[in-house]
Amino acid sequence: MTGFTNAGFENDEPVKPKAGFEPDTASLREKVVLNPGEKWRILKNISIISIAFMVQFTAFQGTANLQSSINAKDGLGTVSLSAIYAALVVSCIFLPTLIIRKLTVKWTLVCSMLCYAPYIAFQLFPRFYTLVPAGILVGMGAAPMWASKATYLTQVGQVYAKITEQAVDAIIVRFFGFFFLAWQSAELWGNLISSLVLSSGAHGGGSSSNTTVSEEDLQFCGANFCTTGSGGHGNLERPPEDEIFEISMIYLSCIVAAVCIIAFFLDPLKRYGEKRKGSNSAAELSGLQLLSATFRQMKKPNLQLLIPITVFIGMEQAFIGADFTQAYVACALGVNKIGFVMICFGVVNALCSILFGSVMKYIGRTPIIVLGAVVHFTLITVELFWRPNPDNPIIFYAMSGLWGVGDAVWQTQINGLYGLLFRRNKEAAFSNYRLWESAGFVIAYAYATTLCTQMKLYILLAVLTLGCIGYVIVEILYRKKQRKLKKQEKLEAAEKEKEAAAAAAAAALAAAEAGADGVEETDDELDDLEEDIVVTRL
Protein backbone atom coordinates (compact mmCIF):
# COMPACT_ATOMS: atom_id res chain seq x y z
CA MET A 1 0.00 0.00 0.00
CA THR A 2 2.92 2.37 0.73
CA GLY A 3 5.21 1.04 -2.00
CA PHE A 4 7.86 0.20 0.61
CA THR A 5 9.05 -3.36 1.25
CA ASN A 6 11.19 -4.38 4.22
CA ALA A 7 13.38 -7.18 2.88
CA GLY A 8 14.32 -8.24 6.39
CA PHE A 9 10.82 -9.63 6.89
CA GLU A 10 10.34 -10.98 3.39
CA ASN A 11 10.11 -14.68 4.36
CA ASP A 12 8.43 -14.22 7.72
CA GLU A 13 4.87 -15.47 8.17
CA PRO A 14 2.68 -14.16 10.95
CA VAL A 15 1.73 -16.70 13.61
CA LYS A 16 -1.98 -17.27 13.30
CA PRO A 17 -4.02 -17.80 16.44
CA LYS A 18 -5.56 -21.22 16.99
CA ALA A 19 -9.00 -21.76 15.60
CA GLY A 20 -11.67 -20.63 17.97
CA PHE A 21 -9.32 -18.29 19.83
CA GLU A 22 -10.96 -15.22 21.31
CA PRO A 23 -9.43 -12.53 23.52
CA ASP A 24 -10.13 -13.18 27.18
CA THR A 25 -11.85 -9.90 27.87
CA ALA A 26 -15.48 -9.24 28.51
CA SER A 27 -15.38 -6.12 26.35
CA LEU A 28 -14.49 -8.09 23.20
CA ARG A 29 -16.92 -10.97 23.71
CA GLU A 30 -20.17 -10.95 21.81
CA LYS A 31 -22.92 -9.30 23.79
CA VAL A 32 -26.35 -10.83 24.34
CA VAL A 33 -28.84 -8.09 23.51
CA LEU A 34 -32.31 -8.59 24.96
CA ASN A 35 -35.34 -6.37 25.39
CA PRO A 36 -37.54 -6.21 28.52
CA GLY A 37 -40.21 -8.33 26.83
CA GLU A 38 -37.79 -11.26 26.89
CA LYS A 39 -38.82 -11.92 30.49
CA TRP A 40 -42.04 -13.54 29.24
CA ARG A 41 -40.08 -15.90 27.03
CA ILE A 42 -37.88 -16.79 29.98
CA LEU A 43 -40.97 -17.60 32.04
CA LYS A 44 -42.23 -19.75 29.16
CA ASN A 45 -38.97 -21.70 29.16
CA ILE A 46 -39.09 -22.16 32.93
CA SER A 47 -42.62 -23.54 32.51
CA ILE A 48 -41.55 -25.89 29.71
CA ILE A 49 -38.66 -27.43 31.63
CA SER A 50 -40.80 -27.73 34.77
CA ILE A 51 -43.66 -29.47 32.94
CA ALA A 52 -41.26 -31.86 31.21
CA PHE A 53 -39.72 -32.90 34.52
CA MET A 54 -43.18 -33.29 36.03
CA VAL A 55 -44.20 -35.70 33.26
CA GLN A 56 -40.85 -37.53 33.41
CA PHE A 57 -41.00 -38.05 37.16
CA THR A 58 -44.66 -38.97 37.12
CA ALA A 59 -43.29 -42.17 35.64
CA PHE A 60 -40.12 -42.54 37.68
CA GLN A 61 -41.43 -41.51 41.11
CA GLY A 62 -44.49 -43.69 40.73
CA THR A 63 -42.26 -46.63 39.85
CA ALA A 64 -39.64 -45.95 42.53
CA ASN A 65 -42.19 -45.68 45.35
CA LEU A 66 -43.40 -49.21 44.60
CA GLN A 67 -40.00 -50.89 44.32
CA SER A 68 -39.51 -51.92 47.94
CA SER A 69 -43.01 -53.44 47.95
CA ILE A 70 -43.73 -54.95 44.51
CA ASN A 71 -40.15 -56.20 44.03
CA ALA A 72 -39.51 -57.09 47.66
CA LYS A 73 -38.22 -60.61 46.95
CA ASP A 74 -34.48 -60.80 47.76
CA GLY A 75 -34.56 -57.00 48.06
CA LEU A 76 -34.56 -56.66 44.25
CA GLY A 77 -36.44 -53.35 44.19
CA THR A 78 -34.18 -51.73 46.76
CA VAL A 79 -31.04 -53.09 45.09
CA SER A 80 -32.13 -51.64 41.74
CA LEU A 81 -32.69 -48.24 43.38
CA SER A 82 -29.28 -48.51 45.01
CA ALA A 83 -27.76 -49.22 41.57
CA ILE A 84 -29.38 -46.05 40.23
CA TYR A 85 -27.84 -43.80 42.83
CA ALA A 86 -24.48 -45.56 42.91
CA ALA A 87 -24.21 -44.97 39.16
CA LEU A 88 -25.39 -41.42 39.74
CA VAL A 89 -22.48 -40.79 42.12
CA VAL A 90 -19.98 -41.94 39.47
CA SER A 91 -21.83 -40.01 36.79
CA CYS A 92 -21.75 -36.80 38.84
CA ILE A 93 -17.97 -37.00 38.97
CA PHE A 94 -17.21 -37.80 35.35
CA LEU A 95 -20.07 -36.91 33.01
CA PRO A 96 -22.06 -33.66 33.48
CA THR A 97 -19.45 -31.05 32.57
CA LEU A 98 -18.19 -33.04 29.58
CA ILE A 99 -21.62 -33.89 28.19
CA ILE A 100 -23.03 -30.40 28.67
CA ARG A 101 -20.03 -28.90 26.85
CA LYS A 102 -20.42 -31.38 23.99
CA LEU A 103 -24.21 -31.52 23.59
CA THR A 104 -25.27 -28.18 25.15
CA VAL A 105 -27.79 -28.00 27.96
CA LYS A 106 -30.93 -28.64 25.90
CA TRP A 107 -29.76 -31.79 24.13
CA THR A 108 -28.15 -33.12 27.27
CA LEU A 109 -31.62 -32.99 28.80
CA VAL A 110 -33.15 -34.86 25.86
CA CYS A 111 -30.59 -37.68 25.81
CA SER A 112 -30.53 -38.05 29.59
CA MET A 113 -34.30 -38.33 29.88
CA LEU A 114 -34.33 -41.22 27.41
CA CYS A 115 -32.11 -43.22 29.77
CA TYR A 116 -35.10 -43.72 32.09
CA ALA A 117 -37.16 -45.71 29.59
CA PRO A 118 -35.50 -49.17 29.97
CA TYR A 119 -35.93 -49.16 33.76
CA ILE A 120 -39.67 -48.60 33.38
CA ALA A 121 -39.95 -51.27 30.68
CA PHE A 122 -38.10 -53.94 32.68
CA GLN A 123 -40.68 -53.73 35.46
CA LEU A 124 -42.47 -56.27 33.28
CA PHE A 125 -39.56 -58.71 33.67
CA PRO A 126 -37.98 -57.95 37.06
CA ARG A 127 -34.71 -59.80 37.47
CA PHE A 128 -31.35 -58.79 38.86
CA TYR A 129 -29.83 -58.95 35.37
CA THR A 130 -32.52 -56.65 33.92
CA LEU A 131 -33.39 -54.10 36.60
CA VAL A 132 -29.88 -53.52 37.94
CA PRO A 133 -28.28 -52.67 34.53
CA ALA A 134 -31.32 -50.56 33.66
CA GLY A 135 -30.94 -48.79 37.00
CA ILE A 136 -27.27 -48.10 36.24
CA LEU A 137 -28.31 -46.51 32.93
CA VAL A 138 -30.78 -44.27 34.77
CA GLY A 139 -28.03 -43.19 37.14
CA MET A 140 -25.59 -42.43 34.34
CA GLY A 141 -28.17 -40.23 32.63
CA ALA A 142 -29.52 -38.57 35.76
CA ALA A 143 -26.43 -36.55 36.70
CA PRO A 144 -26.13 -34.69 33.36
CA MET A 145 -29.90 -34.19 33.35
CA TRP A 146 -30.04 -32.59 36.81
CA ALA A 147 -26.89 -30.53 36.24
CA SER A 148 -28.36 -29.24 32.96
CA LYS A 149 -31.62 -28.34 34.65
CA ALA A 150 -29.86 -26.46 37.44
CA THR A 151 -27.56 -24.66 35.00
CA TYR A 152 -30.52 -23.61 32.84
CA LEU A 153 -32.56 -22.29 35.78
CA THR A 154 -29.63 -20.43 37.32
CA GLN A 155 -28.45 -18.81 34.10
CA VAL A 156 -31.87 -17.66 32.90
CA GLY A 157 -32.53 -16.53 36.47
CA GLN A 158 -29.55 -14.19 36.27
CA VAL A 159 -30.76 -12.82 32.93
CA TYR A 160 -34.29 -12.37 34.27
CA ALA A 161 -32.94 -10.56 37.34
CA LYS A 162 -31.01 -8.14 35.14
CA ILE A 163 -34.00 -7.49 32.87
CA THR A 164 -36.37 -6.88 35.78
CA GLU A 165 -33.75 -5.22 38.02
CA GLN A 166 -34.41 -7.60 40.93
CA ALA A 167 -32.08 -9.42 43.34
CA VAL A 168 -30.45 -12.43 41.70
CA ASP A 169 -30.64 -14.72 44.74
CA ALA A 170 -34.39 -14.11 45.17
CA ILE A 171 -35.07 -14.80 41.48
CA ILE A 172 -33.02 -18.01 41.47
CA VAL A 173 -34.81 -19.35 44.55
CA ARG A 174 -38.18 -18.36 43.04
CA PHE A 175 -37.40 -20.22 39.82
CA PHE A 176 -36.26 -23.28 41.75
CA GLY A 177 -39.43 -23.04 43.82
CA PHE A 178 -41.64 -23.03 40.73
CA PHE A 179 -39.66 -25.90 39.24
CA PHE A 180 -40.01 -28.02 42.37
CA LEU A 181 -43.71 -27.19 42.53
CA ALA A 182 -44.13 -28.91 39.17
CA TRP A 183 -41.56 -31.62 39.89
CA GLN A 184 -43.05 -32.60 43.24
CA SER A 185 -46.55 -32.66 41.77
CA ALA A 186 -45.27 -35.69 39.87
CA GLU A 187 -45.70 -37.52 43.18
CA LEU A 188 -49.40 -36.81 42.90
CA TRP A 189 -49.86 -37.98 39.32
CA GLY A 190 -47.50 -40.96 39.50
CA ASN A 191 -48.99 -42.28 42.72
CA LEU A 192 -52.53 -41.56 41.58
CA ILE A 193 -51.94 -43.70 38.50
CA SER A 194 -50.50 -46.61 40.49
CA SER A 195 -53.17 -46.43 43.19
CA LEU A 196 -56.08 -46.32 40.75
CA VAL A 197 -54.72 -49.24 38.74
CA LEU A 198 -53.92 -51.37 41.80
CA SER A 199 -57.22 -50.56 43.52
CA SER A 200 -59.41 -51.20 40.48
CA GLY A 201 -57.90 -54.59 39.61
CA ALA A 202 -57.84 -57.90 41.42
CA HIS A 203 -55.26 -56.55 43.84
CA GLY A 204 -57.77 -53.95 44.92
CA GLY A 205 -59.17 -56.72 47.05
CA GLY A 206 -55.97 -56.45 49.01
CA SER A 207 -57.71 -53.83 51.06
CA SER A 208 -59.61 -56.63 52.71
CA SER A 209 -56.40 -58.10 53.90
CA ASN A 210 -55.36 -54.99 55.69
CA THR A 211 -58.65 -54.84 57.61
CA THR A 212 -58.00 -58.33 58.97
CA VAL A 213 -54.25 -57.98 59.44
CA SER A 214 -53.31 -59.71 62.65
CA GLU A 215 -52.02 -57.94 65.73
CA GLU A 216 -48.96 -60.13 65.48
CA ASP A 217 -48.17 -58.73 62.01
CA LEU A 218 -48.79 -55.16 63.17
CA GLN A 219 -46.21 -55.56 65.93
CA PHE A 220 -43.54 -55.78 63.24
CA CYS A 221 -44.63 -52.60 61.42
CA GLY A 222 -43.19 -49.12 61.95
CA ALA A 223 -39.88 -48.72 63.78
CA ASN A 224 -39.86 -52.46 64.56
CA PHE A 225 -39.98 -53.41 60.87
CA CYS A 226 -37.06 -55.45 59.53
CA THR A 227 -36.92 -56.44 55.86
CA THR A 228 -35.37 -59.83 56.63
CA GLY A 229 -38.28 -60.78 58.88
CA SER A 230 -41.17 -59.64 56.68
CA GLY A 231 -41.69 -62.87 54.77
CA GLY A 232 -45.24 -64.20 54.76
CA HIS A 233 -46.81 -60.82 55.53
CA GLY A 234 -50.05 -60.74 53.52
CA ASN A 235 -49.92 -57.00 52.79
CA LEU A 236 -46.52 -57.24 51.05
CA GLU A 237 -47.43 -59.58 48.16
CA ARG A 238 -46.64 -58.56 44.54
CA PRO A 239 -49.69 -57.31 42.56
CA PRO A 240 -50.96 -59.28 39.52
CA GLU A 241 -48.84 -59.02 36.35
CA ASP A 242 -51.61 -57.47 34.23
CA GLU A 243 -51.76 -54.52 36.62
CA ILE A 244 -47.97 -54.13 36.51
CA PHE A 245 -48.18 -54.15 32.69
CA GLU A 246 -50.84 -51.44 32.64
CA ILE A 247 -48.88 -49.20 34.99
CA SER A 248 -45.63 -49.68 33.05
CA MET A 249 -47.20 -48.78 29.69
CA ILE A 250 -48.67 -45.59 31.11
CA TYR A 251 -45.32 -44.63 32.62
CA LEU A 252 -43.42 -45.36 29.38
CA SER A 253 -45.75 -43.00 27.53
CA CYS A 254 -44.89 -40.30 30.07
CA ILE A 255 -41.15 -40.68 29.37
CA VAL A 256 -41.69 -40.27 25.62
CA ALA A 257 -43.91 -37.22 26.16
CA ALA A 258 -41.33 -35.53 28.43
CA VAL A 259 -38.56 -35.98 25.86
CA CYS A 260 -40.73 -34.48 23.12
CA ILE A 261 -41.62 -31.45 25.26
CA ILE A 262 -37.95 -30.57 25.76
CA ALA A 263 -36.91 -31.31 22.18
CA PHE A 264 -39.64 -29.27 20.49
CA PHE A 265 -40.52 -26.45 22.88
CA LEU A 266 -37.48 -25.46 25.01
CA ASP A 267 -35.27 -22.61 23.74
CA PRO A 268 -31.53 -23.43 23.68
CA LEU A 269 -29.57 -21.79 26.49
CA LYS A 270 -27.28 -20.11 23.96
CA ARG A 271 -30.04 -17.53 23.60
CA TYR A 272 -29.13 -16.38 27.12
CA GLY A 273 -25.37 -16.58 26.96
CA GLU A 274 -24.47 -20.27 27.01
CA LYS A 275 -20.67 -20.62 26.74
CA ARG A 276 -20.29 -16.93 27.59
CA LYS A 277 -19.70 -17.48 31.31
CA GLY A 278 -16.12 -16.40 30.81
CA SER A 279 -13.73 -16.58 27.91
CA ASN A 280 -13.68 -19.48 25.54
CA SER A 281 -10.78 -20.95 27.46
CA ALA A 282 -13.14 -23.43 29.05
CA ALA A 283 -13.93 -24.82 25.63
CA GLU A 284 -10.22 -25.33 24.97
CA LEU A 285 -9.62 -27.42 28.08
CA SER A 286 -8.83 -31.09 27.72
CA GLY A 287 -11.34 -33.70 28.84
CA LEU A 288 -9.35 -34.43 31.99
CA GLN A 289 -9.27 -30.74 32.87
CA LEU A 290 -13.02 -30.50 32.48
CA LEU A 291 -13.50 -33.60 34.64
CA SER A 292 -11.35 -32.05 37.35
CA ALA A 293 -13.75 -29.09 37.65
CA THR A 294 -16.05 -31.13 39.86
CA PHE A 295 -13.15 -32.17 42.11
CA ARG A 296 -11.81 -28.61 42.34
CA GLN A 297 -15.22 -27.44 43.46
CA MET A 298 -15.04 -29.85 46.40
CA LYS A 299 -12.07 -27.91 47.80
CA LYS A 300 -14.24 -24.88 48.50
CA PRO A 301 -15.00 -24.59 52.24
CA ASN A 302 -18.63 -23.62 51.67
CA LEU A 303 -19.27 -26.73 49.62
CA GLN A 304 -17.55 -28.98 52.16
CA LEU A 305 -19.74 -27.57 54.92
CA LEU A 306 -22.88 -28.20 52.84
CA ILE A 307 -22.02 -31.86 52.18
CA PRO A 308 -23.77 -33.26 55.33
CA ILE A 309 -27.10 -31.52 54.67
CA THR A 310 -26.90 -32.51 50.99
CA VAL A 311 -26.33 -36.15 51.98
CA PHE A 312 -29.31 -35.89 54.34
CA ILE A 313 -31.53 -34.70 51.48
CA GLY A 314 -30.81 -37.95 49.65
CA MET A 315 -31.29 -40.08 52.76
CA GLU A 316 -34.61 -38.52 53.75
CA GLN A 317 -35.99 -38.98 50.23
CA ALA A 318 -34.86 -42.61 50.23
CA PHE A 319 -36.55 -43.13 53.60
CA ILE A 320 -39.93 -41.71 52.60
CA GLY A 321 -39.87 -43.50 49.23
CA ALA A 322 -38.70 -46.94 50.39
CA ASP A 323 -38.78 -47.37 54.17
CA PHE A 324 -41.88 -45.37 55.07
CA THR A 325 -43.89 -46.89 52.22
CA GLN A 326 -42.87 -50.43 53.17
CA ALA A 327 -42.49 -50.38 56.97
CA TYR A 328 -45.48 -48.16 57.72
CA VAL A 329 -47.91 -47.92 54.79
CA ALA A 330 -47.70 -51.29 53.02
CA CYS A 331 -47.18 -53.18 56.26
CA ALA A 332 -50.27 -51.75 57.97
CA LEU A 333 -52.55 -50.63 55.12
CA GLY A 334 -51.50 -52.65 52.06
CA VAL A 335 -49.53 -52.06 48.85
CA ASN A 336 -52.53 -50.53 47.08
CA LYS A 337 -52.61 -47.66 49.60
CA ILE A 338 -48.99 -46.56 49.01
CA GLY A 339 -49.93 -44.31 46.11
CA PHE A 340 -52.72 -42.55 47.97
CA VAL A 341 -50.53 -41.82 51.00
CA MET A 342 -47.67 -40.60 48.80
CA ILE A 343 -50.07 -38.32 46.92
CA CYS A 344 -50.38 -36.36 50.15
CA PHE A 345 -46.58 -36.08 50.28
CA GLY A 346 -46.44 -34.87 46.68
CA VAL A 347 -49.23 -32.29 46.95
CA VAL A 348 -47.93 -30.71 50.15
CA ASN A 349 -44.37 -30.80 48.82
CA ALA A 350 -45.38 -29.06 45.61
CA LEU A 351 -47.40 -26.34 47.32
CA CYS A 352 -44.68 -25.67 49.88
CA SER A 353 -42.03 -25.51 47.16
CA ILE A 354 -43.70 -22.57 45.45
CA LEU A 355 -44.65 -21.01 48.80
CA PHE A 356 -41.11 -21.08 50.18
CA GLY A 357 -39.69 -19.81 46.91
CA SER A 358 -42.02 -16.80 47.07
CA VAL A 359 -41.78 -15.86 50.75
CA MET A 360 -38.00 -16.16 50.87
CA LYS A 361 -37.58 -12.59 49.62
CA TYR A 362 -39.70 -11.31 52.54
CA ILE A 363 -38.42 -13.36 55.48
CA GLY A 364 -35.07 -14.60 54.21
CA ARG A 365 -33.63 -18.08 53.85
CA THR A 366 -32.78 -18.86 57.48
CA PRO A 367 -36.33 -18.97 58.99
CA ILE A 368 -37.43 -21.36 56.23
CA ILE A 369 -34.50 -23.71 56.83
CA VAL A 370 -35.15 -23.61 60.59
CA LEU A 371 -38.73 -24.69 59.84
CA GLY A 372 -37.50 -27.62 57.75
CA ALA A 373 -35.11 -28.73 60.47
CA VAL A 374 -37.77 -28.56 63.20
CA VAL A 375 -40.28 -30.50 61.07
CA HIS A 376 -37.85 -33.31 60.29
CA PHE A 377 -36.45 -33.56 63.82
CA THR A 378 -40.02 -33.86 65.11
CA LEU A 379 -41.18 -36.39 62.51
CA ILE A 380 -38.19 -38.68 62.97
CA THR A 381 -38.66 -38.65 66.74
CA VAL A 382 -42.39 -39.40 66.44
CA GLU A 383 -41.80 -42.27 64.01
CA LEU A 384 -39.45 -43.89 66.50
CA PHE A 385 -42.37 -44.40 68.91
CA TRP A 386 -45.45 -44.49 66.65
CA ARG A 387 -47.00 -47.91 66.07
CA PRO A 388 -48.98 -47.78 62.79
CA ASN A 389 -52.54 -49.09 62.91
CA PRO A 390 -54.96 -49.41 59.96
CA ASP A 391 -57.78 -48.13 62.17
CA ASN A 392 -56.20 -44.64 62.12
CA PRO A 393 -55.37 -44.00 58.44
CA ILE A 394 -55.38 -40.20 58.83
CA ILE A 395 -52.08 -40.39 60.72
CA PHE A 396 -50.36 -41.94 57.69
CA TYR A 397 -51.47 -39.06 55.49
CA ALA A 398 -50.45 -36.45 58.09
CA MET A 399 -46.97 -37.94 58.48
CA SER A 400 -46.55 -38.09 54.70
CA GLY A 401 -47.69 -34.49 54.23
CA LEU A 402 -45.44 -33.11 56.96
CA TRP A 403 -42.49 -34.96 55.46
CA GLY A 404 -43.32 -33.12 52.23
CA VAL A 405 -43.04 -29.79 54.08
CA GLY A 406 -39.53 -30.63 55.27
CA ASP A 407 -38.41 -31.93 51.89
CA ALA A 408 -39.70 -28.80 50.13
CA VAL A 409 -37.52 -26.68 52.41
CA TRP A 410 -34.35 -28.59 51.53
CA GLN A 411 -35.09 -28.87 47.81
CA THR A 412 -35.73 -25.17 47.26
CA GLN A 413 -33.39 -23.54 49.75
CA ILE A 414 -30.30 -25.73 49.42
CA ASN A 415 -30.53 -25.78 45.61
CA GLY A 416 -30.88 -22.01 45.66
CA LEU A 417 -27.96 -21.70 48.08
CA TYR A 418 -25.71 -23.68 45.73
CA GLY A 419 -26.76 -21.42 42.86
CA LEU A 420 -26.01 -18.33 44.94
CA LEU A 421 -22.64 -19.38 46.36
CA PHE A 422 -21.14 -20.94 43.23
CA ARG A 423 -22.45 -18.90 40.29
CA ARG A 424 -19.19 -18.92 38.35
CA ASN A 425 -18.96 -22.74 38.30
CA LYS A 426 -22.58 -23.76 38.04
CA GLU A 427 -22.14 -27.11 36.27
CA ALA A 428 -19.45 -28.29 38.67
CA ALA A 429 -21.33 -27.00 41.72
CA PHE A 430 -24.61 -28.68 40.84
CA SER A 431 -22.75 -31.85 39.88
CA ASN A 432 -21.42 -31.85 43.43
CA TYR A 433 -24.91 -31.28 44.78
CA ARG A 434 -26.25 -34.23 42.84
CA LEU A 435 -23.20 -36.32 43.77
CA TRP A 436 -23.65 -35.90 47.52
CA GLU A 437 -27.42 -36.16 47.37
CA SER A 438 -26.96 -39.39 45.45
CA ALA A 439 -24.46 -40.56 48.04
CA GLY A 440 -27.24 -40.11 50.58
CA PHE A 441 -29.53 -42.33 48.50
CA VAL A 442 -26.82 -44.97 48.12
CA ILE A 443 -26.06 -45.01 51.85
CA ALA A 444 -29.75 -45.34 52.72
CA TYR A 445 -30.39 -48.10 50.18
CA ALA A 446 -27.16 -49.91 51.08
CA TYR A 447 -28.36 -50.66 54.60
CA ALA A 448 -32.06 -50.85 53.67
CA THR A 449 -32.21 -54.65 53.71
CA THR A 450 -29.88 -55.18 56.68
CA LEU A 451 -30.96 -52.61 59.29
CA CYS A 452 -34.34 -52.31 60.97
CA THR A 453 -36.33 -49.09 60.65
CA GLN A 454 -35.48 -47.94 64.18
CA MET A 455 -31.75 -47.82 63.45
CA LYS A 456 -32.39 -46.04 60.15
CA LEU A 457 -34.25 -43.30 62.01
CA TYR A 458 -31.38 -42.83 64.45
CA ILE A 459 -28.97 -42.48 61.53
CA LEU A 460 -31.22 -39.85 59.95
CA LEU A 461 -31.21 -37.88 63.20
CA ALA A 462 -27.41 -37.92 63.37
CA VAL A 463 -26.91 -36.81 59.76
CA LEU A 464 -29.55 -34.07 60.06
CA THR A 465 -27.78 -32.70 63.13
CA LEU A 466 -24.44 -32.55 61.30
CA GLY A 467 -26.12 -30.96 58.29
CA CYS A 468 -27.72 -28.20 60.34
CA ILE A 469 -24.38 -27.40 62.01
CA GLY A 470 -22.70 -27.13 58.60
CA TYR A 471 -25.44 -24.89 57.24
CA VAL A 472 -25.23 -22.52 60.22
CA ILE A 473 -21.48 -22.10 59.67
CA VAL A 474 -22.00 -21.40 55.95
CA GLU A 475 -24.67 -18.81 56.73
CA ILE A 476 -22.41 -17.06 59.25
CA LEU A 477 -19.47 -16.97 56.82
CA TYR A 478 -21.67 -15.71 53.98
CA ARG A 479 -23.17 -12.87 56.02
CA LYS A 480 -19.76 -11.90 57.35
CA LYS A 481 -18.43 -11.75 53.81
CA GLN A 482 -21.39 -9.68 52.61
CA ARG A 483 -20.84 -7.15 55.40
CA LYS A 484 -17.16 -6.94 54.50
CA LEU A 485 -17.96 -6.37 50.82
CA LYS A 486 -20.51 -3.66 51.62
CA LYS A 487 -18.00 -1.94 53.87
CA GLN A 488 -15.39 -2.09 51.12
CA GLU A 489 -17.86 -0.67 48.62
CA LYS A 490 -18.62 2.26 50.94
CA LEU A 491 -14.93 2.99 51.48
CA GLU A 492 -14.17 2.94 47.77
CA ALA A 493 -17.23 5.05 47.00
CA ALA A 494 -16.19 7.60 49.62
CA GLU A 495 -12.69 7.71 48.16
CA LYS A 496 -14.08 8.36 44.70
CA GLU A 497 -16.29 11.14 46.01
CA LYS A 498 -13.32 12.74 47.74
CA GLU A 499 -11.24 12.67 44.54
CA ALA A 500 -14.12 14.16 42.57
CA ALA A 501 -15.06 16.82 45.12
CA ALA A 502 -14.42 19.63 42.63
CA ALA A 503 -16.60 18.04 39.95
CA ALA A 504 -20.30 18.55 39.40
CA ALA A 505 -22.81 16.58 41.52
CA ALA A 506 -23.70 14.29 38.63
CA ALA A 507 -20.05 13.50 37.97
CA ALA A 508 -19.47 12.79 41.66
CA LEU A 509 -22.40 10.38 41.73
CA ALA A 510 -21.11 8.58 38.63
CA ALA A 511 -17.68 8.27 40.22
CA ALA A 512 -19.20 6.81 43.38
CA GLU A 513 -21.09 4.21 41.35
CA ALA A 514 -17.95 3.33 39.44
CA GLY A 515 -16.15 2.83 42.74
CA ALA A 516 -18.60 0.07 43.65
CA ASP A 517 -17.45 -1.91 40.60
CA GLY A 518 -13.96 -2.34 42.02
CA VAL A 519 -14.93 -5.09 44.49
CA GLU A 520 -13.05 -8.29 43.92
CA GLU A 521 -15.27 -10.94 42.40
CA THR A 522 -15.65 -14.24 44.18
CA ASP A 523 -17.91 -17.24 43.83
CA ASP A 524 -20.86 -15.65 45.59
CA GLU A 525 -20.54 -12.37 43.68
CA LEU A 526 -21.16 -11.34 40.07
CA ASP A 527 -20.97 -13.87 37.26
CA ASP A 528 -19.16 -12.85 34.06
CA LEU A 529 -22.52 -13.31 32.37
CA GLU A 530 -23.61 -10.03 33.99
CA GLU A 531 -21.24 -8.16 31.67
CA ASP A 532 -22.50 -9.93 28.55
CA ILE A 533 -26.22 -9.19 28.92
CA VAL A 534 -27.36 -5.89 27.46
CA VAL A 535 -30.98 -4.89 28.09
CA THR A 536 -32.42 -2.45 25.57
CA ARG A 537 -35.06 -0.24 27.20
CA LEU A 538 -37.10 1.06 24.27
UniProtKB/Swiss-Prot annotation:
The chain crosses the membrane at residues 46-66, 80-100, 105-125, 128-148, 170-190, 244-264, 305-325, 338-358, 366-386, 394-414, 435-455, 457-477. Glycans are attached at residues 45, 210. It comes from Drosophila melanogaster (Fruit fly). It is a multi-pass membrane protein. Keywords: Glycoprotein, Membrane, Transmembrane, Transmembrane helix. Belongs to the unc-93 family. This is UNC93-like protein. One of its GO terms (molecular function) is potassium channel regulator activity. One of its GO terms (biological process) is renal system process. InterPro entries: Ion_channel_UNC-93, MFS_trans_sf, UNC-93_regulatory.
